[in-house]
């Protein structure tokens, strides 16, 4: 008897090869001669390598520095794999995303590795209404011939995966998601994960066939009646390679079976679009937080990676959004348990947010994104079509206010974030949004220059600067972070005066300036900061 759990989730049918970025930090690997060595992982499922403490690329088998010829061969292999993985997205540009009312998650064991986490716990992590957890552990590693121990404490988490997608969509979509299994596959984990996940397609195929044999009706997962299952998510037992698991483990990713040598048909439907991730965190030894799941499921929705997917130049000049964003390094926030909420751009792309275009000079009061449900857009000509997944002009800037609350609790800082968008259908389709220093697709405008591999509080305004003048004729000055998280600033030199704006949501309170005093506007009534009606 299969056990099915339901959860409110979201899905779409965009299918481009995408994956989790490698977790930064030292991990221990064992060479073929038994020697242990501290290494650092770079890249993602489709293009990755490891280095030693000095930054030398290492041979995966011997853990010795590669020769120039070996590195060139690795670069060629990575390029070939990227080219092979580039697939065309199903047409969605300029049209409504195809949101499936139900989705399927299949738990699988390997022949030599079974789930140690109870199915009920996985269920709660995916769909629990009030999911929470706490734990602590010591992580020991060697660096520069010295041994260090890092004590990690997680005293609470953001919530379940269901809660994450409900929150970041502001409750606009509530499909059902079913969790089944675990089922046991026919082979050891190394069979599916070896040689850069060479046989992972067979894991997806077997998982679907085992679920089908158990009575799962796949026809309910073809929302648009196109003869294909909208998507399948496989959660596999044990470690994943992205956060330090052995090389033979599978790297969490999103892909399409139709662009591999594997074909799968169940209940007369083709299985194509899939995502997968691991049960256990290599660092903690406990079940993985929702960060990886939410990152991979965001690809199912149609969102691309925002870290550098080219791999070869990682951390050597391309500064991406890092811990600020779920599609970059953010899924590792709070030990992988509290990924950041969707940015204004991601909500704009999904159709959940329509930013306001700044035109004339004004003194702006901008509430935190999740309170005001608002963002501001700046572009040449001061006019925009406001279609997130087919923008015109394609180049524009978004300003949003973020505070360290809710899913954003573990952001590097808070305040005003300004992001430059340079949309290219080709780069989005091929998951290469931020692979060129001169052609970044989603580029955080750091308030203070930051070239490190870590996001900083000074990336935000006003922590890094109280003005922004990088975009001619769209200057922001007097940027101020107020108690409660809102920001104010002068746009195009406007003086601070009373701010008259509309309410962002039916019952959402909004702080405003009235005759130089801070007041709160809610349901058509003005209140002072003590809650007295004015």
Give residue ranges: language-model regions.
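N-terminal prosegments of processed precursors
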Residues: 19-97, 367
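Non-catalytic C-terminal accessory/binding modules of secreted extracellular proteins
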Residues: 31, 116-121, 125, 131-156, ...
């Amino acid at each position: 008897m299969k056990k099915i759990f339901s959860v409110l989730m979201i899905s779409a049918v965009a299918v481009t090869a995408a994956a989790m970025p490698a977790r930064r930090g030292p991990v221990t690997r064992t060479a073929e001669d038994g020697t242990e060595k501290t290494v650092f992982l770079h890249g993602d499922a489709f293009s990755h390598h490891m280095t030693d403490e000095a930054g030398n690329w290492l041979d995966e088998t011997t853990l010795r520095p590669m020769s120039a010829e070996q590195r060139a061969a690795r670069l060629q292999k990575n390029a070939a794999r990227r080219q092979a993985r580039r697939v065309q997205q199903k047409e969605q540009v300029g049209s409504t995303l195809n949101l499936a009312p139900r989705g399927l998650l299949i738990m699988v064991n390997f022949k030599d590795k079974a789930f140690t986490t109870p199915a009920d716990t996985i269920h709660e992590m995916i769909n629990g209404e009030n999911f929470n957890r706490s734990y602590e552990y010591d992580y020991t590693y060697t660096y520069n011939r010295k041994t260090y121990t890092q004590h990690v404490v997680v005293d609470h988490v953001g919530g379940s995966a269901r809660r994450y997608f409900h929150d970041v969509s502001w409750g606009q979509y509530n499909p059902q998601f079913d969790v089944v299994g675990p089922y046991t596959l026919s082979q050891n984990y190394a069979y599916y994960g070896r040689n850069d996940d060479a046989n992972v397609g067979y894991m997806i195929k077997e998982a679907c066939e085992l679920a089908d044999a158990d009575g799962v009706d796949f026809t309910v997962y073809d929302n648009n009646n196109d003869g294909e299952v909208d998507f399948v998510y496989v959660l596999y037992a044990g470690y994943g390679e992205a956060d330090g698991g052995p090389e033979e483990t599978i790297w969490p990713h999103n892909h399409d079976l139709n662009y591999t040598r594997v074909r799968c048909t169940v209940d007369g439907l083709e299985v194509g679009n899939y995502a997968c991730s691991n049960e256990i965190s290599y660092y903690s030894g406990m079940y993985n937080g929702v960060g990886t799941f939410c990152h991979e499921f965001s690809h199912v929705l149609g969102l691309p990676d925002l870290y550098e997917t080219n791999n070869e130049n990682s951390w050597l000049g391309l500064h991406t959004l890092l811990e600020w964003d779920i599609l970059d390094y953010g899924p590792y926030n709070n030990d992988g348990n509290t990924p950041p909420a969707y940015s204004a751009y991601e909500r704009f792309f999904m159709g959940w947010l329509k930013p306001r275009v700044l035109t004339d000079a004004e003194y702006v009061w901008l509430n935190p994104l999740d309170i005001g449900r608002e963002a501001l857009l700046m572009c040449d000509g001061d006019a925009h079509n406001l279609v997130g997944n087919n923008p015109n002009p394609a180049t524009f800037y978004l300003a949003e206010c973020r505070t360290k609350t809710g899913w954003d609790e573990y952001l590097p800082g808070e305040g005003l974030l300004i992001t430059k968008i340079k949309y290219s259908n080709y780069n989005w389709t091929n998951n290469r949004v931020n692979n060129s220093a001169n052609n970044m697709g989603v580029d955080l405008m750091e308030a203070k220059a930051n070239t490190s591999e870590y996001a900083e509080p000074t990336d935000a305004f006003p922590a890094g600067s109280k003005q922004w003048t990088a975009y001619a004729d769209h200057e922001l000055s007097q940027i101020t972070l107020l108690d409660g998280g809102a920001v104010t600033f002068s746009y195009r030199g406007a003086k601070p005066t009373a701010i008259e704006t509309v309410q962002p949501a039916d019952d959402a309170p909004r702080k405003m300036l009235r005759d130089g005093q801070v007041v709160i506007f809610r349901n058509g009534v003005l209140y002072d900061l003590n809650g007295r009606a004015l």
